[in-house]
Regions:
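Carbohydrate-interacting regions of secretory-pathway proteins
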Residues: 20-249
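Bacterial Sec-dependent N-terminal signal peptides
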Residues: 1-20
């Protein structure tokens, strides 16, 4: 028993002395060196590695589902849904990303609930199936509706942590960090999608797990390509957008 105790004490003492001899330099990691990215002058401005999806001048990077050029109305550096013309989606495909966009719901209030300032940002929209992962856009300023359908919700899945909505007619921001889902070769989910969202600078979704496509009914996953378009929804309301940029992650 004494030998056992002595052996344990020796091991502890040797371990302490040995750890004291470790140089701090041995814990320093120099490679790989992070890529230099020049930030914008404010958090709203696109950094140097961003893909600008709307430059305030044209919708050249957007199309309708039928492949025709986007027909929404452009004015003074922003564009507005043309009700009935159909949703628009990016020509390019994306997976995991950091997405910044600004939106404004109509200053002239019409309707209530889901009929007021309604649109949506669909991440990884699959044209073939009509499915995607929707971040709800809505006028949620003094406009009660079901909580998992208000502004900043993962539609009918996750309620936003708080309601950070501004008044109608004021510009608002979404900063979305999206981690795309991964699928096994047999089409089963290897890793679900996750999303973090800041609404007007306020955290409203904190690494929320997306349970599947946000279409009507119980959400479920279906295997899809690793990159797909982003869609902005025509829900029949005059919602405006500006300053849209994205960083691939």
């Amino acid at each position: 028993m004494k030998k056992r105790v002595l052996l344990i004490l020796y091991s502890i003492t040797f371990g302490i002395l040995n750890s004291q001899n470790i140089k701090y330099e041995n814990r320093e990691v120099w490679e790989p060196e992070p890529t230099i990215v020049s930030p914008g002058s404010s958090f709203r401005d696109a950094p140097s590695d961003a893909i600008v999806l709307f430059n305030g001048l044209n919708l050249n990077k957007w199309i309708h589902k039928n492949g025709e050029p986007a027909k929404w109305d452009i004015k003074d550096g922003y564009f507005t849904v043309r009700p009935g013309s159909g949703s628009i989606l990016t020509k390019d495909f994306f997976g995991s990303c950091q997405l910044h966009l600004e939106f404004m719901t109509p200053v002239n209030i019409e309707g209530d609930g889901q009929n007021r300032g309604n649109s949506g940002v669909f991440l990884m929209y699959n044209i073939e199936t009509g499915n995607g992962y929707e971040v709800q856009v809505l006028d949620s300023y003094n406009n009660r509706t079901y909580s998992n359908g208000q502004a900043g919700s993962i539609y009918e899945q996750h309620i936003p942590l708080v309601n950070a909505s501004k008044k109608p007619g004021e510009w608002q921001t979404y900063d979305i960090i999206f981690k795309a889902p991964l699928f096994n070769k047999n089409g089963e989910v290897k890793s679900p999608a996750y999303v973090t969202i800041f609404h007007n600078g306020v955290l409203i979704q904190d690494n929320s797990e997306i349970k599947g496509f946000t279409n009507i009914g119980y959400p479920k996953y279906e295997a899809h390509p690793s990159k797909l378009p982003i869609l902005l929804q025509d829900h029949g309301n005059l919602v405006s957008f500006r300053n849209i940029w994205l960083r691939e992650l």
